[in-house]
Amino acid sequence: VHNPYSTPGGWGFSDVNTMNPDVDDTTAALRAIRQAAAKETALRHAWDRANQWLFSMQNDDGGFAAFEKNVSSRFWRYLPIEGAEFLLMDPSTADLTGRTLEYFGTFAGLTKDQRAVSRAVDWLLSHQERNGSWYGRWGICYIYGTWAAITGLTAVGVPAHHPALQKAVRWLLSIQNDDGGWGESCKSDGAKTYVPLGDSTPVHTAWALDALVAAAERPTPEMKAGFRALFRLLHHPDWTASYPVGQGMADAFYIHYHSYRYIFPLLALAHYEQKFGPLDD
């Protein structure tokens, strides 16, 4: 609606939604077709159109939102509508901006030297929390946002020794549980501050590990403890395996994505082995 002059080219949330594309699902689809698009003309056209649409969705502030462009007026917050901030606004967020940067760097071969990418990097760096974390709008919550930001920034060439990344790493390590894993309560998004769950979840642990791997120059004891915790959680699943880590509206609507407990641990382990070799512990 707010980007009417762009050529359609995105993908939507679900296999039957062809009317409402969003940034995150578009980058997910582009990741999936990248190799085939290099060989098949029809897919190459889809790849090109989707990338053009993706760039057209960058907000004026440099970040990326989910469904709309430049819908971030604070006016909506003052309407007497419960949840107006989540229902009527679609501002730039750390999770969408970070995941888009990760796509640009890892799958599209772009770096922070490109202007659009540089603007997104600047937006992320200017929206880091004082404690080093980032708030994630569509997941739970600060672990999720910090994972998206770290992996996005490193993918486009921000060095691991950058002060913002090292501050984020220190924050992640400061909230690591005694069992080696990570877990965050859904209460975080309503409180607008990190609230520990009290137990580790496989998804939060995988997100934290993936972020640490991206920002590390070598394996660390904390990283290996995290993988040991992750393997325990996967081999002996309990209630934490189905704890919701997706968010629709703070304090009201949460989502359990059944595939997350498999996808993100696999990604974290694959990224570790690609960077450091086989996990020897």
Residue ranges and their predicted role:
Residues 1-281:
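Preference for long, amphipathic alpha-helical scaffolds in soluble/luminal domains
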